Regions:
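Alpha-helical, largely C-terminal catalytic domains
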Residues: 1-348
């Protein structure tokens, strides 16, 4: 990325989805923060403080209809996955080699099996995962438990693939990147967590339906590009390469505004595909199938991730408070923080 890439215009993006918070968000944030503080490793007090600022905001936005007892599990599982994701770009941690990442993924997989967690580089993550997985496995219906387990194992494998890609210098082709991120962005896991949260047990026929397969692809693309739109300043500061905006801007292939506009176009196209496929699936659903509340939960998830990505201190810097503008000028500041102003687009 060149030295001139410090500012871009964010237009008003039309959305057909509405974000909402879980009605017991303050209580969940307190309980989830206490669990994360006790169970997860942090590098220092500042690291812990910064993480606990937003530890449960993401799950409270993306699964707002989950029952309270299951929402506690979702908060804790989300915290584990988020902290693991933070370790991957660190060359002094599990990200220092594909072999280290593979060993770490095996350790995490063992935590899902009920076996004793073996010693490893970050035993805190595996033991925390074992704790929350034990609770989830005891409540989930067999099919839901299997979908959660498969999606977690797939996520761990994608973490290894991400580390391997970083070691090779990252991606230069957007299509290859999107293919990997279809797994590593956690869309499959987030969807299974949505099913668990509302207490559904969906029919197997849904998961073999071609229209549902296409809907899941739209979910993954929406999550990926929304994340990348709002996180690239943060990820650039961390020396990251796993971001669509950074890939499009690499080696001067596109100016920042052009890259942002491309990503915004992909977000809007993914949302249009999602809503069209959702409506077709709803037209065929029966009340007994539980498909309608599940698809509503997926729509909540996309809207919540959009709001979270726009407003989170995780991506915009400690202490960030949203103004709350949804369009205007986004300024990238030294240290990876951002600010939003209502300045007119230079071309307008």
């Amino acid at each position: 990325m060149t030295a001139t890439m410090y500012e871009f215009h964010l237009p008003q993006v039309p959305s057909r989805l509405t974000a909402r918070y879980h009605p017991r968000s303050p209580e969940l944030q307190g309980l989830g923060g206490a669990w994360a503080r006790a169970r997860l490793p942090f590098s220092d007090a500042d690291d812990e403080h910064d993480f606990l600022q937003y530890a449960c905001l993401f799950p409270c936005l993306v699964w707002p209809r989950a029952t309270f007892d299951r929402m506690l599990d979702l908060c804790d599982l989300s915290s584990v996955v988020s902290r693991i994701d933070d370790t991957l770009p660190n060359p002094g941690d599990v990200g220092r080699s594909e072999a280290h990442a593979t060993a770490f993924a095996r350790e995490l997989g063992a935590a899902l099996s009920g076996r004793e967690v073996p010693p490893g580089q970050e035993p805190g993550y595996a033991s925390a995962l074992s704790d929350v997985w034990g609770r989830i496995a005891g409540k989930a219906a067999p099919g839901v438990r299997e979908r959660l387990s498969v999606s977690l194992h797939n996520l761990f494998r994608s973490f290894v693939a991400e580390v391997a890609s970083r070691r090779r210098g990252g991606f230069t082709d957007l299509a290859d990147y999107v293919e990997l991120r279809a797994h590593s962005v956690g869309a499959q896991l987030c969807s299974a967590m949505a099913e668990y949260g509302i207490g559904a047990d969906l029919p197997d026929s849904l998961f073999t339906d071609p229209e549902y397969t296409r809907l899941q692809a739209a979910v993954a693309e929406h999550l990926t590009f929304v994340n990348d739109l709002f996180t690239f300043a943060y990820e650039r500061h961390r020396g990251e390469a796993m971001n669509a905006v950074l890939i499009l801007c690499g080696d001067g292939r596109a100016a920042l505004q052009e890259a942002v506009d491309t990503v915004l176009g992909r977000i809007e196209a993914a949302e249009l595909r999602f809503t069209a496929l959702r409506d077709r699936l709803l037209a065929r659903a029966t009340a007994a199938s539980q498909v309608e509340p599940y698809l509503t939960a997926l729509a909540d998830m996309l809207a919540g991730n959009w709001h979270w990505s726009r407003t989170s201190p995780r991506y915009h810097g400690p202490g960030f408070v949203w103004n709350p503008l949804t369009a205007g000028t986004v300024t990238l500041r030294p240290g990876g923080s951002t600010s939003f102003t209502a300045a007119r687009h230079p071309a307008s």
